[in-house]
Curated annotation (Swiss-Prot):
Record protein name field: Elongation factor Ts
Span list, region Involved in Mg(2+) ion dislocation from EF-Tu: 80-83
Protein biosynthesis is among the record's keywords: yes
InterPro entries named in the record: EF-Ts_dimer_sf, Transl_elong_EFTs/EF1B, Transl_elong_EFTs/EF1B_dimer, Transl_elong_Ts_CS, UBA-like_sf
GO cellular component terms, A-Z: cytoplasm
Gene Ontology molecular-function annotations: translation elongation factor activity
Record key words, sorted: Cytoplasm, Elongation factor, Protein biosynthesis
Gene assigned in the entry: tsf
PROSITE patterns reported for this sequence: EF_TS_1, EF_TS_2
Species name: Pseudomonas fluorescens (strain ATCC BAA-477 / NRRL B-23932 / Pf-5)
Function: Associates with the EF-Tu.GDP complex and induces the exchange of GDP to GTP. It remains bound to the aminoacyl-tRNA.EF-Tu.GTP complex up to the GTP hydrolysis stage on the ribosome.
Compartment(s): Cytoplasm
Length: 288
């Protein structure tokens, strides 16, 4: 059995984030084999992770890896924004997006499986639930990306043009959040909903007006709605005198697609109730 030195305990502590006594105990049990000790601690980390699995992870970070021809967007969630700013979390996210890009993954499932051991160590170390939520890979003639403060990530695929142009359009997408690429992609249902809302809001204004005037008012609103909802019709944020579609055409490009991730989209955040939390802690203490 190898000697359990202070240096060995320190190394295990740095690699796992566990307490000194826990590290010494794990090394003793593993006969001084640090890798075996880590494996054993993963098992205990998995127990801790299971306890955290019910906690809502709605904060986190977006990461991007690209090479001008392909890009991967990745969202990794944490429970608090504080953890998302810590080096351990950042390292996990960076390693995950690098692997996803290198392995040309198009879905999160294989990445989740590959990174599970590292995730469990991170959960055990930080005490927070951490999840790889989603991943997207895009490829094309020209690919440009934009990352806004690790909270919003965008990848734009162009046919023709330049990476710089694609990056400019990606920055616009981050700021303006279009729902569609083209007006023709807006569903009839979405148009009808917009029409119904417009009629409801302007009911008084339309009273007594001829039908043709009402139709023109509706057509004007729908036209504005299509321009607001579709990327190519939006005014470019850097130069509102030109649309994004015209900008692309001027740069000799056609916009093929855009992908936009924002941290926590669609996740219902848990609102903590302090009284309920205290009651739950007291109930748990009684059961121990």
């Amino acid at each position: 059995m190898a000697e359990i030195t202070a240096a060995l305990v320190k190394e295990l502590r740095e690699r796992t984030g566990e307490g000194m006594m826990d590290c010494k105990k794990a090394l003793t049990k593993a006969g001084g084999d640090i890798e075996k000790a880590i494996d054993d601690m993963r098992a205990s980390g998995a127990i801790k992770a299971a306890k955290k699995a019910g906690n809502v992870a709605a904060e986190g970070a977006i990461a991007i890896k690209d090479d001008g021809k392909a890009a991967v967007l990745l969202e990794v969630n944490s429970q608090t924004d504080f953890l998302a700013l810590q080096d351990d979390f950042k390292a996990f996210v960076a390693a995950s997006v690098e692997k996803a890009f290198a392995d040309k993954l198009t879905d999160a499932a294989p990445l989740i499986e590959a990174q599970e051991a590292a995730r469990l160590i991170l959960v055990g170390k930080t005490g927070e639930n951490v999840n790889i939520r989603r991943l997207a890979r895009v490829e094309g003639d020209v690919v440009g990306t934009y990352l806004h403060g690790n909270k919003i990530g965008v990848a734009v695929v162009l046919k023709g043009g330049s990476v710089e142009l694609a990056k400019d359009i990606a920055m616009h997408v981050a700021a303006s959040n279009p729902e569609f690429l083209l007006p023709s992609q807006v569903s009839a249902e979405a148009i009808e909903r917009e029409k119904a809302v417009f009629l409801q809001l302007n009911e008084d204004k339309m009273k007594g007006k001829p039908a043709e005037i009402v139709e023109k008012m509706i057509a004007g609103r729908i036209s504005k709605f299509l321009a607001e909802a579709s990327l190519v019709e939006q005014a470019f944020v850097k130069d509102p005198e030109i649309t994004v579609g015209a900008l692309a055409k001027k740069g000799g490009a056609e916009i093929v697609s855009f992908t936009r991730f924002a941290v926590g989209e669609g996740i219902e955040k848990k609102e903590d109730n302090f009284a309920e939390e205290v009651a739950a802690q007291l109930a748990a203490a009684k059961q121990q």
